[in-house]
């Protein structure tokens, strides 16, 4: 991962700009391939088997969508950014992969793609009132989505997020155990590889969204603050 990060950092940013749409198209083809030859696992069809490893195209699309939107707005006059006709292409670029990801189904990644795209549109200069209209439309559509679009497990995730205690041994198990791990880390943590929640299988999926709880248990509040500081440095450096 670190080697790949360094290689990407060494590539001239103009190369990413030139090939942004090509990368997006490749990611889109991979998402379509999931529909045709995708591997099913844990009740979802999200991966493509490449022999040596399985690739999750939605992860590639997270990067490809950012590049494509950045490329589009790079060539858009600033005074034209907020006009409706200049929003058609970005909306299509966003909604097509989101729809494909929702079919897998992968609600979390779909929401992340939407959130990332929204941030880019804001930074590009799209007026806030347009987002207010969009947000109002989404709120109005929530009952319809809940009734007709969301799968049972997706509804469980939403309800569990709002109240993990409703099913502490089922859907809420990971959240409950992650809270225990966060609290047990204390100020300085239990030490590297010494976390009981993470290494005694109380958090069986600790390598996924719950990786932060593993860090908190082993390195405590100080370790968490150190991680936050690194993120802040990256953001500050990006704006500098």
Features from the language model and the residues they span:
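Membrane-helix interface and discontinuous TM-entry motifs in multi-pass inner-membrane proteins
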Residues: 95-108, 182-197, 201
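Long extracytoplasmic/lumenal interhelical loops at the membrane interface
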Residues: 186-222
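Hydrophobic alpha-helical transmembrane segments of multi-pass inner membrane proteins, especially
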Residues: 1-174, 213-240
């Amino acid at each position: 991962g670190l080697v790949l990060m360094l290689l990407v950092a060494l590539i001239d940013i103009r190369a990413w700009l030139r090939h942004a749409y090509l990368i997006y198209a490749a990611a889109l083809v991979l998402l379509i391939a999931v529909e045709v030859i995708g591997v099913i696992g844990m009740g979802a069809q999200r991966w493509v088997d490449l022999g040596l490893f399985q690739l999750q195209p939605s992860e590639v699309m997270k990067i490809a969508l950012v590049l494509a939107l950045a490329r589009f707005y790079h060539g858009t006059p600033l005074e034209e950014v907020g006009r409706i006709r200049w929003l058609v292409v970005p909306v299509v670029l966003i909604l097509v992969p989101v729809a494909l990801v929702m079919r897998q189904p992968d609600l979390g990644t779909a929401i992340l793609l939407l959130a990332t795209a929204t941030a880019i549109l804001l930074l590009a200069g799209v007026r806030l009132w347009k987002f207010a209209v969009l947000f109002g439309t989404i709120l109005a559509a929530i009952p319809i989505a809940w009734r007709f679009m969301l799968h049972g497990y997706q509804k469980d995730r939403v309800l569990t997020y709002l109240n993990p205690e409703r099913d502490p041994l089922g859907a809420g198990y990971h959240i409950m155990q992650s809270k225990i791990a966060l609290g047990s880390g204390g100020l300085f943590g239990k030490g590297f590889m010494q976390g009981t929640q993470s290494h005694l299988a109380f958090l069986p999926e600790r390598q996924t969204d719950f990786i932060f709880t593993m860090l908190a248990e082993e390195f405590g509040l100080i370790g968490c603050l150190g991680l936050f500081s690194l993120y802040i440095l990256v953001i500050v450096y990006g704006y500098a």
